[in-house]
Structures are given as structure tokens and as C-alpha cells.
Amino acid sequence: MSFTDDHDHAACQRPLERVRPFDAAAFERAVADMLTASGIAIDPIHTGKTAQRVRELWQKRLLDGYDTVPAEALGSGFADERRDMVVIRSLAVHGMCPHHLLPFRGVAHVAYLPGGRLHGFGRIARMVDAISHRYTYQEWITHEIARTLVEHGEARGAACLIEAEQLCLLMGENRRGDERVITQCYAGDFETDAEARNQFLRAIER
């Protein structure tokens, strides 16, 4: 997997945390200013409600992950002695690249090896949303999903593979438009158990 220079963020592993509350009024003013700076007049027919619409989309769908702690979204699950691998294929996932403020979207394949607790599938999906609906990178999301299942979900191991379309890549110069980025992370027993990794990869094959 290769990235442009803009994706040279391997040395920085800290999430981009929110340092103050979302300011809806300031956000709408910024969108209106961007339209004006682009040379576009704000008129009642086409752009009069654009600032409000953009703010609602960003606040409610693109950045709503900041309103939820991933571990709380996952919850504690329930006690269960089963140890067989649990795999969820093709969870919708999207995030916002902080470099160009362009979204990326794709699917996340998630697996975990229970360590005494099972977790609801909806809970896992909400955890993925809490992790990804932020200013973030695909690599960080992949790592954080696996890490959260092990550290907070008490899983013996966890795996995550994400395949996504990165608009900052797709819209670059001389691109074909069908590029995809694949990232994967293995935590806990998955790191040392090659058979578990292979079983996971077989399970998510289309």
C-alpha cells in the first residue's frame, strides 16, 4: 500500500481529538464565507440554505463520532464461554480526511475471538461509527477497531480489514478513478496465530 506525501502520517498515532464543542453558528458562517470566497453569490434559490445543510450533514453524519466514546458504544457485552471466531462482513464505514477535508468510504470486515464475553452486532457497528465519524485516517480506524475489541471488549484477539475509496486519491491528477485502499490490523491472538488470520481472510472472501 502506498500513499502520497500528504499521507505521511505514520509518525503521528494520536487521534485528532475535539478540543472544544461543535459551534454550529460558526460552522455555517464558515461555509457561507467559503461560497463567497469561491466567487459564488448566496441567493435564496440555490445556495440560501447551503450553509445549514452542510452543517447538518457534517454535525450529524460526518463528525458525530466525537459525541460517542467508542468503548461506551461497544459496551460490556454479556458473559459467554464460546470461543469460536465471530466475523461481521461489510460494515459500512466512512471518515473525513483532515488533509483535504474530503470523505472516504468503504466497508469494514471485523472479527474477534471471544475471551469470555460476546457483543451485540449493533453495538459493534456503533463502535465502528464512533471511531470513524471523525477527522481521521483509514489506517487509524482499522487499528482502533481491533484495539477497542481487545482492550475494552475483552476479546482474546481481533482483526479488522477495511477497503475504501479515498476521494483525495480518486480525484488526484492522472487517476483512473477506481483506486481502492486496503488496510488491515491484527491484535491479540491474531498477531501470532496465522491460522486464525487465514480463517478470517477466508470468511470475508467474496
UniProtKB/Swiss-Prot annotation:
Keyword match GTP-binding: yes
GO BP of this protein: one-carbon metabolic process; tetrahydrobiopterin biosynthetic process; tetrahydrofolate biosynthetic process
Key words of the record: GTP-binding, Hydrolase, Metal-binding, Nucleotide-binding, One-carbon metabolism, Zinc
Reaction catalyzed: GTP + H2O = 7,8-dihydroneopterin 3'-triphosphate + formate + H(+)
EC numbers, comma separated: 3.5.4.16
GO CC annotation: cytoplasm
Binding site for Zn(2+): 97, 100, 168
Keyword Transferase: no
Pathway: Cofactor biosynthesis; 7,8-dihydroneopterin triphosphate biosynthesis; 7,8-dihydroneopterin triphosphate from GTP: step 1/1
NCBIfam families named among the record's database cross-references: PRK09347.1-2, PRK09347.1-3
Family: Belongs to the GTP cyclohydrolase I family.
Subunit structure: Toroid-shaped homodecamer, composed of two pentamers of five dimers.
Protein name: GTP cyclohydrolase 1
Organism encoding this protein: Chromobacterium violaceum (strain ATCC 12472 / DSM 30191 / JCM 1249 / CCUG 213 / NBRC 12614 / NCIMB 9131 / NCTC 9757 / MK)
Encoding gene (name): folE
